[in-house]
């Protein structure tokens, strides 16, 4: 509730959780923000080695996205770049359906932004031997945090992470020219963030 109260009127909150608490978390967030301020449930899909067991292999977590005020929140559309063929002079081919109902490829002057970002994000977990890895148990990939920050803030906006853990959110906010503030309850998180 306190974090909700501290949000700017055009602010939003993203909450990451896994299958153990996602159902409960959604109910708590609906109570705090109101169901009308729920924006998306994002599925963060990742690939990793799965061991055969008596259930489906777990390969995603949930991220709940809420606005403080649905009518005022910042949302910058993100796009997946098209893999369309491009001509030598920068023009691109797009698929259109004509008046006769037949699909055709047409050369366009406009450079396509791509397809609007869906709510299923395939982003790899951090490589166990990668330079990005800090050995913090709940560390998120910079690509995941970057996508969230770009979608809901503009340059010089303030990004807050009240459970900053490894400090990934703060590092990405700095790279994207955002102001930031972070806190954590654990000494290990604070020392890792430094």
Where are these regions (language model features)?
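Core catalytic lobe of class I
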Residues: 1-192
